Regions:
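Interfacial helix-cap and linker-helix signal at transmembrane-aqueous boundaries
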Residues: 47-52, 78-81, 112, 165-174, ...
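Short hydrophobic/small-residue motifs within alpha-helical transmembrane segments
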Residues: 65-70, 156-157, 324-325, 421
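Helix-to-loop junctions at the C-terminal end of transmembrane segments
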Residues: 71-87, 170, 330-347
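Hydrophobic transmembrane-helix bundles of small-molecule transporters
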Residues: 173-285, 290
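Hydrophobic transmembrane architecture of multi-pass small-molecule transporters
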Residues: 417-534
């Protein structure tokens, strides 16, 4: 888009828009798009009460949106060359707005999941269009370690702030108003695009030939099958239910078909060479371990704050401000040390897992009935800080893959796990462990309580039952925090046992001219075949 050593410009803007203002308008568009989605998981409880859907239904729709976002990365450069910027933003804004209206008015679960999936895909498309437009403004050297710091600053900040906005609307009026607000914001964005953007093409046009659409759909089915098993497993009693067995079979079959097709078709959605590259499974494993260690933030923290400490939704969501500060500090630290000073991947990951271990150790030693709200600030801050470092370091490491195809496929696989699958897998493992351990602890705590025990004789049964459950919950959380702390310590030792001096020195994004040439060479046989048939 921009030639080296030339002044940065965004040619799709009309001439009356000041040059200094153009990147900030694009960032505004990114923020609006990142706030949007099919469903808003912060309002899950309110949606369950209003729509009579299961909690699992809402979670399935929310994570389906993240799967749609991840799958877009497999074709991100192709759509950049195929569609004009103005058309992209208008189309994506319109689709996401319609998805919001449908999501707030339907109780049909397949429709809700499908709409959320589509909304996630177009949300990522609009985000990539905007971010790629201002990449040279953010980092003139095209340093992806710098660029990814910006990406996670925007994405994670939007997650925290959208949760706050959702609860604000839910308390003030109804969760529906969050959808109305997002639709209005998207309409404003579309109006600005129509007024400020020229209908021009800033990239050489390349048609969408040679894209494995069937492969993309099957990878999506595989991911959604994993989500279904993890989210609905406890509800349906795992593989005793035909629903879970069917989803498992569907996931295994589509995964096998994808790998089989990738062995002989010309342009598979994910090449086998990408999956064989050592950096891809390593990054996926790191993200799964990190998400397992951070799973208590999704389960234990809410159980502690709601069930034990008695916080309402406003008090719980206000802690997102602490996570927001942790995001900013984590991004600044990563930018200064990793992007600027080029600290090694090993050092950054050791720091990140140390922060996560501090989070686990804090709750292991401090968890109690009477924790003040201020006592939760430190662990929430350090877990967010640690996660940001892991995410940026892992994503940057994928630049070792060749551009453009292997890189974008590696990013797709990493995002498929980091955004959706790893978190759900981690939460499922910890939730299952919590159920088993809590049942055991409740049995141990209540084994001496009977109708002739003087200590419990005059205590009402329901009060006694509630006390046992609360105590069993605290004992269970403490025990699992301890287990996870040992896993975190083992991860730190494994990362530090062998010195690695690999640093993010050659993480430069190629120019779009170079990428377009590679894509043109890739699709030229397909174009020749189409011309012959015509």
């Amino acid at each position: 888009m921009h030639a080296p050593n030339q002044k940065f410009e965004i040619p799709q803007f009309r001439s009356f828009v000041p040059e200094w203002l153009r990147p900030w308008i694009v960032i505004l568009f990114v923020i609006i798009v990142q706030f949007s989605g099919g469903v808003y998981l912060a309002a899950t409880s309110e949606m369950v009460g209003t729509t009579q859907l299961l909690n699992e239904d809402i979670m399935m729709a929310g994570y389906a949106s993240l799967v749609g976002m991840a799958l877009f990365f497999g074709m991100m450069f192709r759509v950049k060359f195929a569609v004009k910027p103005r058309t992209t933003l208008l189309m994506c804004g319109g689709v996401i707005a319609v998805a919001n209206l449908v999501a707030m008015n339907t109780t049909n679960v397949p429709l809700l999941v499908g709409v959320s999936f589509v909304a996630g895909f177009f949300r990522m498309w609009a985000t990539f269009e905007c971010n790629s437009t201002i990449q040279l403004w953010l980092t003139p050297k095209r340093d992806l370690s710098v660029f990814f710091c910006y990406v996670y600053l925007i994405v994670n900040s939007a997650i925290q702030l959208s949760g706050i906005a959702t609860i604000f609307f839910s308390v003030w009026a109804s969760w529906h108003f969050m959808h109305y607000f997002i639709v209005a914001a998207l309409l404003v964005m579309m109006l600005l695009v129509m007024l400020l953007y020229k209908d021009i093409r800033v990239m050489p046009h390349l048609p969408l030939y040679g894209i494995d659409w069937l492969g993309m759909i099957m990878w999506g089915i595989t991911a959604l099958s994993v989500l279904f098993v993890c989210l609905y497993g406890e509800h349906y009693d795992w593989w005793y239910a035909w629903q879970i067995r069917t989803a498992t079979l569907c996931g295994v079959v589509t995964l096998a078909l994808n790998l089989w097709r990738a062995s002989f078709i010309r342009h598979p959605y994910i090449m086998l060479d990408t999956l064989k590259s050592p950096i891809v499974p390593i990054t996926i494993a790191i993200m799964i371990i990190a998400d397992v260690l951070l799973a208590p933030s999704h389960i234990f923290e809410h159980a502690l704050m709601e069930g034990v400490l008695g916080y309402d939704a406003e008090n719980i969501i206000s802690l997102n401000w602490v996570a927001f500060v942790g995001t900013i500090v984590g991004v600044l630290f990563t930018w200064l040390t990793f992007a600027r000073r080029k600290w090694s991947y090993q050092r950054m990951l050791v720091i990140a897992f140390t922060a996560i271990a501090l989070y686990l150790a804090y709750f292991y030693f401090v968890i109690d009935y009477n924790l003040p709200k201020e006592a939760l600030y430190f662990p929430i801050f350090v877990r967010t800080f640690g996660y940001i470092i892991v995410a940026v370091a892992v994503l940057t490491s994928l630049t070792r893959l060749s551009f453009p195809f292997h890189f974008m496929q590696g990013v797709m696989m990493q995002n498929l796990f980091s955004a959706s699958l790893a978190g759900v897998i981690g939460t499922t493992i910890v939730a299952r462990a919590m159920k088993v351990v809590m049942t055991r602890n409740a049995a141990w705590l209540s084994e001496g309580m009977d109708s002739i025990s003087l200590s419990t004789l005059r205590t009402p049964f329901m009060a006694l039952y509630g006390e046992v459950q609360v105590q069993a919950l605290l004992e269970t959380m403490k025990e699992i925090y301890g287990w996870l702390l040992w896993v975190a310590i083992a991860a730190i030792i494994a990362l530090g046992v062998r010195y690695s001096g690999i640093r993010p020195r050659h993480v430069i994004h190629p120019t779009f001219r170079v990428i377009s040439k590679a894509v043109r060479v890739s699709i030229s046989p397909v174009q020749r075949l189409i011309r012959r048939r015509a």
